[in-house]
Design a protein with these regions (language model features):
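Juxtamembrane helix-loop junctions of ABC transporter transmembrane domains
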Residues: 2-4, 8, 40-56, 60, ...
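Membrane-integrated ABC transporters
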Residues: 1-41, 55-77, 92-96, 100, ...
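Helix-loop-helix
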Residues: 58-59, 166-180, 254-332, 337-341, ...
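ABC-type nucleotide-binding domain
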Residues: 64, 354-631
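Alpha-helical transmembrane segments of multi-pass membrane proteins
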Residues: 33, 43, 81-100, 151-158, ...
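An intracellular "coupling" helix at the cytosolic face of ABC transporter transmembrane type-1 domains
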Residues: 21-24, 120-121, 139-146, 150, ...
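Transmembrane helices of ABC transporter permease
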Residues: 26-39, 148-202, 275-295
Length: 631
């Protein structure tokens, strides 16, 4: 429990530090307005006492004429303080709106930018709906925390202190009675609050789980309907929803029961203070106070009102603490996302444009058709340039997604510039894993991977991936025009270059037949296009990047036979002069590969050309002749 309390304090401290960094001038000004507003709103009780004292004195002396002046003065001061309170409240509300929305904007940017630097492993191991929950549910709870809970908590705390000082000024005897009741209220608050706090974090996590499930089902709605699993899906959602209901009910039950309990305790305390005041007045007990004034009706009546105000503020503090705890649960999750370790990149070799002068490669700023690896040497400060060719070699590579479970064993292969290498094997054999190692989505456990003779660990990941083109089986398109989606492969590409890439991929003809041609909007991952059309656009996107190395996850496996013939002609031109790795899902597309690697349980068991492997009559032969099915 102490660790959890410490974590909450650390989160709150970090939140204030972040807000101060965002608004170093405005935040202190707003806090001053909050404090002034709270103090000013508590002062009218003093004027109330003065007015009652004047009336009491006039009643005793029967001199009402002399009472009008002091009463008018105190009423005027009361109006002035109310106006000041209104002005401070307006300034606080206006400034807090700027701080809240501005901070959330900057925080969302910080979250999103940080997310772009996370390794692929993070997205493979976290539910996408849960990640979305950071930007929706957690951000909303943080908004309530910054804009409402914390300011109200400060106002209530300052009001408590202000009223406490005023009560001490009037009567310490009555104040002791109030404090005895407040101690009991504090015990109840701690008991109930600690019970609800643990459920608020569970509630945030349950919301993320629920949103993750909904997002998953939305993406797979067609599969659900094809297999008629609507009722089973509803049952699964009911279980998740029941869990969310349970933790939310527990958290809010404790939180909502606190305020009524404190209000009733406050009412009881009000009666007790009234009785105590009456007894002290009747008994003629000497008053003990900072002011030194005798106990009278003019003191007792305002004191009773302050008692109600004091208990109300105590209740507000307790209520806001629960809101703060819930908000901190969201803040804790958000800071957890921000604190996720970014993808490590210790590379220092970069990819640059070069031109050839006097037989040597010279770096240049303008765009050329020639690229080279810029390799600085720390020993003597020299720089060497290695022309980008697309020579990829793996030597005795071992890898496991979990270090304790190796899934690739002793992988050794080489792909010379311009070669086409195909990976064949059942699901789980390691085909996709090998390509994930080439682009360094994951780092190897043992062995070496060299790109143009350079250890890929020395190459900056962004530059390494810029030299690779990837075409996935499951096409991903973004909201925007067809032209924008093609240009995503190279943001500096001109319209003519994008159209040329579309022609190369065989996509130009169908694009020109779209309602707006290249300006046709793509929505919902290209749901307004056929699977084949989406695949053609993704191929054009890779073509405009013009990389020396291509990785293809059997890009044509989702395209019909007629479209495949169109695509294959473009792909043959695209692959010419490039190193190509193909993850094969059907053997008819790999016959013309220079080398075919047959994988089984993370090992290369056969390698060679199509004719060589057929002649060996091994596993590839069995797959090709249908003795085994390729998955």
């Amino acid at each position: 429990m102490k660790n959890k309390v410490g974590a909450k304090k650390g989160t709150l401290k970090r939140l204030f530090k972040m807000l101060f960094e965002f608004y170093p001038v405005l935040l202190p000004m707003v806090l001053v307005c909050v404090v002034l507003n709270a103090m000013i709103s508590s002062v009218p009780a003093v004027f109330q006492q003065n007015i009652i004292a004047v009336v009491e004195q006039s009643w005793q002396t029967k001199d009402w004429g002399s009472a009008s002046g002091p009463i008018l003065k105190y009423v005027s001061l009361l109006i002035v303080f109310y106006v000041l309170s209104l002005a401070a409240g307006y300034a606080f509300s206006y400034g807090m709106a700027i701080i809240t929305q501005g901070s959330l904007k900057k925080l969302r940017v910080k979250m999103f930018n940080g997310m772009q630097d996370l390794p692929i492993k993070y997205f493979d191991t976290h539910n996408h709906g849960d990640i979305m929950s950071y930007y929706t549910n957690d951000i909303d709870t943080l908004r309530q925390l910054i804009s409402q809970s914390i300011p109200q908590l400060i106002i209530s705390c300052v009001s408590v202190l202000t009223v406490f000082c005023i009560m001490m000024y009037y009567s310490i005897w009555l104040l002791l009675v109030v404090l005895a009741g407040v101690v009991l209220m504090g015990v109840v608050t701690k008991k109930v609050g600690s019970s609800s706090a643990k459920y608020f974090l569970h509630q945030q996590m349950a919301v993320g789980k629920s949103e993750g499930f909904v997002e998953e089902i939305m993406n797979g709605q067609k599969v659900v309907k094809v297999f008629c699993h609507e009722r089973e899906t509803e049952a699964d959602f009911d279980k998740i929803n029941d869990e969310l209901f349970h933790v939310s009910e527990q958290a809010n039950r404790y939180a909502n029961m606190l305020m009524p309990i404190l209000m009733n305790m406050g009412n009881v305390l009000y009666v007790i203070v009234a009785l105590a005041g009456g007894i002290l007045l009747l008994a003629g007990t000497p008053n003990f106070s900072i002011s030194g004034m005798a106990l009278s009706i003019s003191i007792t009546v305002p004191f009773l009102n302050m008692t109600r105000q004091f208990c109300g503020n105590i209740g507000q503090v307790s209520n806001q603490i629960n809101s703060v705890v819930m908000g901190l649960a969201g803040a804790e999750r958000i800071f957890g996302l921000i604190d996720e370790q970014a993808e490590k990149d210790e590379g220092y070799v970069t990819l640059v444009n070069v031109k050839e002068e006097n037989g040597e490669l010279v770096e240049c700023k303008e765009r050329t058709d020639m690229w080279a690896w810029k390799h600085p040497h720390s020993a003597d400060g020299s720089i060497t340039y290695t022309r980008l060719q697309g020579d990829v070699r793996m030597t005795e590579v071992d890898f496991g997604y979990n270090p304790e479970k190796i899934v690739l064993h002793d992988i050794t292969l080489y792909a010379e510039p311009g070669q086409k290498v195909a990976f064949v094997g059942a699901t789980g054999a390691g085909k996709t894993t090998i390509t994930n190692l080439i682009n360094r989505f994951y780092d190897i456990a043992d062995g070496k991977i060299r790109y143009d003779g350079i250890n890929i660990n020395k190459i900056k990941k962004a530059d390494l991936r810029r030299s690779l083109g990837i075409i996935l089986q499951d096409t991903v398109l973004f909201s925007g025009t067809v032209m924008e989606n093609i240009r995503y492969g190279n943001l500096d590409a001109t319209d003519e270059e994008c159209i040329g890439a579309a022609r190369l991929a065989g996509a130009h003809d169908f694009i020109t037949r779209l309602p707006e041609g290249y300006n046709t909007m793509i929505t919902a991952n290209g749901s307004n296009l056929s699977q084949g059309q989406r695949q053609l656009i993704s191929i054009a996107r890779a073509a405009v990047a013009d990389p020396p190395v291509m990785i293809m996850d059997e890009a044509t496996s989702s395209i019909d036979t007629r479209t495949e013939a169109i695509v294959q002609r473009g792909m043959d031109a695209l692959m010419h002069g490039r190193t190509v790795f193909v993850i094969a899902h059907r053997l008819s597309t790999v016959r013309n590969s220079d080398v075919i690697m047959v994988l089984e349980q993370g090992r290369i068991i056969e390698r060679g050309s199509h004719d060589d492997l057929i002649a060996q009559k091994g596993k590839y032969y069995q797959l090709y002749t249908g003795a085994f099915e390729l998955e």
